[in-house]
Amino acid sequence: MSFNHQTIEKKWQKYWLDNHTFKTTEDKDKNFYALDMFPYPSGAGLHVGHPEGYTATDIISRFKRMQGYNVLHPMGWDAFGLPAEQYAIDTGNDPAEFTEKNIATFKRQIQELGFSYDWEREINTTDPEYYKWTQWIFIQLYKKGLAYVDEVAVNWCPALGTVLSNEEVIDGVSERGGHPVIRKPMRQWVLKITEYADRLLEDLEELDWPESLKDMQRNWIGRSEGAEVAFEVENLDHSFKVFTTRPDTIYGATYAVLSPEHELVAAITSEEQAEAVKAYQEQAARKSDLERTDLAKDKTGVFTGSYAINPFNGERMPIWISDYVLASYGTGAIMAVPAHDERDFEFAKQFGLDIKPVIEGGDNTSAYTGDGAHINSGELDGLNKEEGIRRAIELLEAKGIGEKKVSYKLRDWLFSRQRYWGEPIPVITWEDGSMTTVPEEELPLMLPKTEHIKPSGTGESPLANIDEFVNVTDPVTGMKGRRETNTMPQWAGSCWYYLRYIDPKNSDMIADPELLKKWLPVDLYIGGAEHAVLHLLYARFWHKVLYDLGVVHTKEPFQKLFNQGMILGEGNEKMSKSKGNVVNPDDVVASHGADTLRLYEMFMGPLDASIAWSTNGLDGARRFLDRVYRLLVNEDGTLSEKITEQPVGSMEKVYHQTVKKVTDDYETLGFNTAISQMMVFINEGYKSEQLNIDHIRGFVKLLNPIAPHITEELWEKLGGTESITYEAWPVYDESKLVDSEVEIVIQVNGKLKQKATIAKDMDKSEMETFALSLEAVQTAIEGKTVRKVIAVPNKLVNIVAN
């Protein structure tokens, strides 16, 4: 007999919606905030990868409600961004309508999976009542001096008519559409995330996050200590600075390299080299930073025709340009020490430049990067690395040509996009050159509706074409001004959405401070590892700014974070439309049911593992739920006669073991092993002639967070008059986890005569009396004298007789 998942799931989804079952409670003394990374509502709808993380947070939310917590478990939509705009450009449709339609699909799919979201808290980043506060936060950043305009060399994609982030450029072409990308300087809004670099680094220590993820953030921030050194250009009134972590190797600096974009390149390039330098700069502009720093690629470069002077030994150092030096890192210039740096060594070999060892221990076949005594280094000779660095910095500072410095790989956050479908930046530039933010009482600054959202082509956003939006007049002074036409990146709305869920309808502030105190930090945040750096770093940055403003009272937004693994196609390949291996959850819900999909995805393996989808595995998950239903319900839908009010001793131990194991495993997100234990319980249930009703009620509660529909149905059949949602979580009895009886071996002269079940911890004399009373033993010792009886508690009795 199989249960009818379609009827049961529709029935309970309607019940939950009609009864507002998952409306966030506020009346208990414990709070738990379980958050999903909210989705971008694409045209494709949900795929089976989405529900994995959503099911995990849903299990924890349902589990915590039963444990007596107020649970905040919301859902919303990260709905601005490139794909909707690209669709609108391709089809001529309005991105707002497209987005609305996609959200409706996502919401239907999510509701059909039985997730216990409080839909009264639903948010949408494109809702003016939401982005009013995204704009408000931008204004606070501006007031604090953390938002500024700069000319930045950016990834410009002429075909898309926009600037792309480094992550959106792959091998010199746009990730979307494969269009060529070049580097060109443009006026951009930038946020000063670097001001928070040390705090972003230090506060990672306090977080319960995977260590691998913390390391990714540490590497992205990339803090390094060293020195900044000034180099004079020979015969020209110019100098440039380099940052180095190894100022002690300065005597081994035999050439210098500037990035092709360095501001000094034009001024120091000789006439003979001008053509080669210009051609090289154009070539470098077509590469992404990632390609340029690829260690495996051959080094390229061009001599500028000028020389720098080594400030320690006075030697001439040819100045080259090469794309392995980035304008955005350090000072955009390096002193090259080929004897002790792998990249510098390869470059020197390629172009026949001098290699001068200044640390003992190497040979001339490769760069020596180990420690050793300094040589060929004047007064640094004989010192080791640490001493050498310290002394070199003292000498630099004494000569006035350098100083101790901390550098970061982290760059300020390029915040503007030359697109239409994003939050307008609330800034006006006036004809006298001054700049002001839009008065806060006038927020939200609405995104104007327009038919023409093709990029302007000039690098400005399509908003630049809408005169009634762009042109403003100050009502007091009559001065004319222009609104900012860049929009915010998609990251903006997702930087703070977890705060808005706490108080989503507040029109006076982001959220009530008392509610923020009550719910923050987020107790559990689950999402994909692809957001390990950017989203999480940006959200942490904004949170720290809001902390400094007194808006929030915690230093960090997300206390515990977990990355679910990826669900791959059946052949262990990533699911993609082009491979035709995408599994649509709608199909699975129709054929097997939402409970089966949830159970299967949690049973595939550990939550953080990447595992291939298997139709057999899905069938197995359904068979288990059928077995649960068959054990408890008769063909006619009534409760099985096996279920009794009487105690059933044979099931005591496995029941209490199951409560303990499932509770412990849910706490650690070990859902696959929790399910295994529930399978053990059901197997034992089939062997038992009777089932105690309290055991069954407890079991149904344990299964509920994973399979909520079937368990609501079973709960009703067990006499429940309300939803199982707020029933108390089962507790186990420690004393019932151990057996009250044990099986022992009975031997005569070392030969097995019988196995017998006795009370656990029976004392030796009782064991002897028991063994001697057995018929098999009496037969074996008939006519013999018992010489000795050896009893080993809980194990065996051996009777020696002859």
From Swiss-Prot:
A motif ('HIGH' region) lies at residues 39-50. The keyword NADP does not apply. One of its GO terms (molecular function) is leucine-tRNA ligase activity. It is an enzyme of class 6 (ligase). It comes from the Bacteria. Its EC number is 6.1.1.4. Its main location: cytoplasm. Keywords: Aminoacyl-tRNA synthetase, ATP-binding, Cytoplasm, Ligase, Nucleotide-binding, Protein biosynthesis. It catalyses: tRNA(Leu) + L-leucine + ATP = L-leucyl-tRNA(Leu) + AMP + diphosphate. One of its GO terms (biological process) is leucyl-tRNA aminoacylation. ATP binds at K577. A motif ('KMSKS' region) lies at residues 574-578. It is found in: Cytoplasm. Signal peptide: none annotated. One of its GO terms (cellular component) is cytosol. Belongs to the class-I aminoacyl-tRNA synthetase family. This is Leucine--tRNA ligase. It comes from Macrococcus caseolyticus (strain JCSC5402). The gene is leuS.
